[in-house]
Amino acid sequence: MIMELENQLSKLHELKNNLKEMGASLDLASLEKKSAELELKMQEAGFWDDVQKAQEVTQEAKRVKDKIDKFKNLNERIDDVEVLKELMEENDEETAKEIISEVKALSKEIDTLKIETILSGEYDRNNAILTLHTGVGGSDANDWTEMLLRMYTRWCEKKGYSLETIDYLPGDEAGVKSVTLKVKGEFAYGYLKAEKGIHRLVRISPFNANGKRQTSFASVEVLPELTSDQDIEINPVDLRIDTYRAGGAGGQHVNKTESAVRITHIPTGIVVQCQNERSQFSNRDTAMGMLKSKLIELKERAHKEKIEDLTGELKDMGWGSQIRSYVFHPYSMVKDHRTNVETSNVNGVMGGDIDNFIIAYLNS
């Protein structure tokens, strides 16, 4: 207990210095000024005339205030632990346990704040559009795509993010051929951009009667959902819009009306589709949002003027192109080939514990 307490008190000093450095990079005075300006803006006459814009300003005001409050709260808690240490009597195990627990909690929260300070790209705070596609591997690959879908769903639950299914195409025999989700929450894109690439699975195939080892691939594509002030104009002449009957898990509304929408951007050949809503108008609106995100990504790839984290094409979905390997047999190991971070806790990873991989990539 004494040795662990000493280690945590040493860690506390390190955390205090880290927080001080972050305070300088955050520029707290500027944040407080921005918070005051946003508060005044929200009090202006006619503020709610443009509801969407007003909601975005309100959300921005909350984000800024939350960041200020979080930083101040962490500083106060460090001070409280230091006071507790001074007041602690000899052999006071209860207070020692309290200090150890609080320093561990502070360490985790300061690490999160550090990452969110790094996530300063234009789109990092945005919601994310996450698309999974089956690669090489047949039914095994479809099953692998569904496993990844569960992994990201559980990760989102841990983060407090909400999910909305935009498009879903089941596999012929098992699993999922492709699925597109909207991940809603602050920094959803900033975190998930670290997952963009090819994911490889090695295991004994449940679809092979001889129990042979099978390698499967799936791709992960991540785009930011644009806000109104990041919007772009698209010439209607450049679009081909097709409607079709929605498929899916069944129900009285499935396959009865042509509510699903597919939009093709003729100059680039980009195709997006949405079948989530019962309304054709809603599906068209969602699909247009996805198209704009893809066009923004295309522009950033071509010019590399604003941000670097949208660059890079997905390679062919096969050997040698993966960003991460998930090996279930002949041993258990998940390894990220970009950072060399690895773990033998395969079940934990598939249960959504992927922050170690994401944070290592963002710090690299």
Swiss-Prot record:
Modified residues (N5-methylglutamine): Q252
GO cellular component: cytoplasm
Transmembrane segments: none
Domain of life per record: Bacteria
A GO molecular function held by the record: translation release factor activity, codon specific
Compartment(s) of residence: Cytoplasm
UniProt cross-references to InterPro entries, sorted A to Z: PCRF (IPR005139), Pep_chain_release_fac_I (IPR000352), Pep_chain_release_fac_I_sf (IPR045853), PrfB (IPR004374)
Post-translational modification: Methylated by PrmC. Methylation increases the termination efficiency of RF2.
Alphabetical UniProt keywords: Cytoplasm, Methylation, Protein biosynthesis
A Pfam family hit: PCRF
NCBIfam families in the record: prfB (TIGR00020)
Role this protein plays: Peptide chain release factor 2 directs the termination of translation in response to the peptide chain termination codons UGA and UAA.
Similarity comment text for this entry: Belongs to the prokaryotic/mitochondrial release factor family.
Name used for this protein in its record: Peptide chain release factor 2
